[in-house]
Amino acid sequence: GGQKSTVATMTEIYHFLRLLYVKLGTQYCPTCNVPVIKQSKDQIFASIMKTYKGKEITFLAPLVKNRKGFYKDLAVWARNKGYKHLIVDGEKVSTLRFPSLSRFTEHNIDLPTGTVKVTPENEGEIKQLVAVTLDFGKGILDIEQKGKKRTFSSTSNCPNCQKSFPELDPRLFSYNSKHG
């Protein structure tokens, strides 16, 4: 349109609607149909102690979720923090010999912060791993046990079924994205 045009097309407004849905929308659990709520570190810790009692689990901090890029700097950051491995697209990779990632391919990168057996003797270590992993994962941590992953979130958790959800992303509301 011209300089004085005030007509907006749906395509122009759509970007703002996606942001509006993410920032002001209320996320609901698809199973229970109730709004999801915030969960404290202590609640996440208690849930882990109950769910994985007697089992060996690995704490994973999701650093990159379905994003394009090289991420060499992430390997350097992890190495400087004392971590020797990252999980890149499901494969364990050394931070010393981090591969060249395709810039135009979406990647998932997780930081394994620790592996521990869930017992009362290890409560202190588990509490510390919960805090560190939530910090690195920006409020989200994954638990891996025998190849199965479960997400715990301090920002969106169902009060009924205790299922956690990742934070909303504008890409979820886009027909141009494979996530939406």
Where are these predicted regions, by residue range?
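Conserved phosphate-binding elements of NTP-dependent enzyme cores
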Residues: G1-G180
